[in-house]
Amino acid sequence: MTDINMNDCKMRGWMGLALWGALAAAPAGASTDLAQKNACMSCHAVAKKLVGPSYNDVAKKYAGQKDAAASLAKSIKSGGAGKWGPVPMPSQPGLSEADALALANWVLAGAK
């Protein structure tokens, strides 16, 4: 049997938690910047409808759907019309697949 040092276990636990927190927080800030950089905020807001639906409404629509992030990322990248009213969403050909997925995950997580 090995001797387990409880202080060592606690320290590793706290270090892991701190690392997880730092990693979890990074994409949110990055996605906010990404949304601003790609002019998403010109038509969308977190909690209210502008030209397009609010991010909260989008998250509600996709809630519980299998592959919601991939589906939303595809819509972000290719644009479309008729899902949210008469104003079409333009395609985003300059947006990478990874950035579209990051934006989709950010929206689905409450755009925080």
Q: Predicted regions: what is each one?
A:
Residues 29-46:
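Sequence/structural segment immediately N-terminal to covalent heme-attachment motifs in c-type
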Residues 111-112:
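Short, solvent-exposed mixed-charge patches
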Residues 23-27:
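N-terminal signal peptide c-region/cleavage motif recognized by signal peptidases
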Residues 10-20:
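Sec-dependent signal peptide recognition
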Residues 42, 51-62, 74-104:
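Axial heme c-ligation environment in periplasmic c-type cytochrome domains
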Residues 1-12:
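N-terminal secretory signal peptides that target proteins for export/translocation
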